[in-house]
Amino acid sequence: MRYYVETDGRVFLVERGDRLDLPRPEEIPFPVEPIAPLVGDDVWFCVPSLDKHPRSWHHKDDLPTSDRALPEVRSAIHATMPRVVVEGLCLREGRILLVKGSRGLTEGRWTLPGGFLRFGESPEACILREIREEVGLSGSIDRFAGVRSKLGRRSRLHWTMLFYRVAVHGEPTPAPDEIAEARFVPIDQAPEMLHDEDMSCVLRGLTDRPAG
């Protein structure tokens, strides 16, 4: 068992020869709180209890390119990076647009249109792009509708989900390489169709009314 200990963008590591490695529990000279596993069950993310800022610890942003950092350190850092996705709530006359993926994490599952936020992209631009790419519809932002954050049960990644109400016109045309099916379904039926509980929770609190 090894711990990944991070605070304020700095990481506590130990030296093994000329390499930097993740510490074992007995090598940590301060209290820590284990939060969740990162890489398999052998590496856990931990929060330290400290009296002051750890100036001598290693900068997290420097470690991925450090020749001294062992691959396990780099893997742990990669696992801690939040994954940001943007989801669209496209409502029409008491119905909401759902899509069923044809590949990847959502293959064969109903979900909301949306996807990963690109580097340098705004969330608003992201969701409009994703809707256009997935179902061929142009849209306009109605309003921000909420944010959810979780640790994935299977992926063990930290997911941040941003939700936007989006007005779209026309009928969806699924992009076959990405979407197997797309349709508007009654809002009260949609939460039970979705595979993601956070999406379902957002929809259960949703009302079909204009902003203002």
Where are these regions (language model features)?
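A generic structural signal for short hydrophobic patches within well-formed alpha-helices
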Residues: 190-191
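Conserved Nudix-box catalytic region and its N-terminal flanking loop in Nudix hydrolases
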Residues: 4-40, 95-133
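Acidic pyrophosphate-coordinating catalytic loop
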Residues: 77-79, 148-161
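Conserved N-terminal beta-strand and adjoining loop/helix that marks the start
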Residues: 1-12, 74-96, 113-116, 165
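Acidic, metal-coordinating catalytic segment for phosphate/diphosphate chemistry
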Residues: 45-89
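A short coil-to-beta-strand element that immediately follows conserved catalytic motifs
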Residues: 138-147
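Phosphate/ribose-recognition catalytic cores of enzymes acting on nucleotide-derived substrates
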Residues: 157-171
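Short, well-ordered beta-strand micro-motif
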Residues: 90, 163-167, 183-186
